[in-house]
Amino acid sequence: AYSSEGYVLHTSDGRTYLYLQHLDDNDYRYVNVFRLDQGMPSYVGYEGMAWYNAQILDPDSFVLYTRLDVLGTYYGMKRYHVDEAGLPASDDEAYVINESSMLRSTRDLAVTILEKNGSETEATVLSGTGYTIFRTDGASYADAHLNDGRDCRIQIKEGSRGWGWDIDGVSEEECFEWFPYAG
């Protein structure tokens, strides 16, 4: 690691943990967790997520970011709390993505339109539409703002080639012009 920084977290039931964020190659960050209240510090575990520039002020509610490779490379945010083992645990189903590039479709796509009132409607969105990813569970769907003002859910499955994603059985590369994947 090139640098490290940490937070000491005190839980309401008297446990104390050190969350240590490390900066590694390619700006990759990760967290090691140590328990501090049992005499000698003990290693609890590793998490491939980090707080970056956020602050951890409350062990019951803090933000961590995870690198996601879903229709591009993004950092997804979830709210976490310290669980019984001392590791971060989230009740959030999906990651929120704050910074994303617009993807332009190269074919008509079957999506679920997410209505403002909470209802959902199946629709086909025409080729040439712009999609900006804003939320994903990292495994089965990506939600996007469309350039016509609507929001939609794109169902995804692990790519049939062993990498990437398929949308309706078609490789993501055949559905969009390009992706902002890192590396």
Residue ranges of predicted features:
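Beta-loop motif signature
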Residues: 96-152, 166, 170-183
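Ordered hydrophobic segments in well-structured contexts
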Residues: 6-10, 15-21, 28-35, 130-133, ...
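Solvent-exposed strand-loop boundary residues in beta-sheet-rich modules
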Residues: 37-40, 148
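Short aromatic loop motif centered on NTY/YTY
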Residues: 5-8, 16-32, 40-118
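Terminal domain-start segments
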Residues: 1-2, 183
